Structure formats: C-alpha cells, structure tokens
Amino acid sequence: MPKMKSNKGASKRFKKTASGGFKCKQSHLRHILTKKSPKRKRQLRAKSMVHEADVKLVVRMLPYA
C-alpha cells in the first residue's frame, strides 16, 4: 500500500506538541493593522493551540506528525 500524503498547507501551519496537541499562529496580523491597538497586535503574536474539536481534522491532514 502506498504512503499517505500529508496536506502540505497544514504541515506548514501546524506543529505537534509533545502532549499530542497542535500549535499554530494566530490570524488577523497580516493587513489592516492601523486600527488595531498595539496591545491587540502584541497578543496576536503569541502562538495558540488548535481547539480540541478541530484536532481530529488536523490529525487526518498530517498522518505522520
């Protein structure tokens, strides 16, 4: 049986943690930044964890993660 393919878009966006979760970059930090406060932009720089309801979908996209 051939190898399963990883979703390349997902492999660039998600990293698996030691406990089995996935971390990812937060959105809303690419453009239209002038109306956002410095505090909001600073907090958006932090990594966030994928919600537990979505972990199963990410696991399917990354079979070897």
Swiss-Prot record:
SUPFAM superfamilies (UniProt xref): L35p-like
Tell me one GO molecular function of this protein.
structural constituent of ribosome
Q: Name one GO cellular component term.
A: cytosolic large ribosomal subunit
> Known InterPro entries for this protein?
Ribosomal_bL35 (IPR001706), Ribosomal_bL35-like (IPR021137), Ribosomal_bL35_CS (IPR018265), Ribosomal_bL35_sf (IPR037229)
Q: Residue ranges of region Disordered? A: 1-26
**Keywords on this record?**
Ribonucleoprotein, Ribosomal protein
Q: Can you supply a Gene Ontology BP term from the record? A: translation
HAMAP family associated with the record: Ribosomal_bL35 (MF_00514)
PANTHER family per UniProt: 54S RIBOSOMAL PROTEIN BL35M, LARGE RIBOSOMAL SUBUNIT PROTEIN BL35M
Annotated family: Belongs to the bacterial ribosomal protein bL35 family.
Record-given protein name: Large ribosomal subunit protein bL35
Species this protein is from: Idiomarina loihiensis (strain ATCC BAA-735 / DSM 15497 / L2-TR)
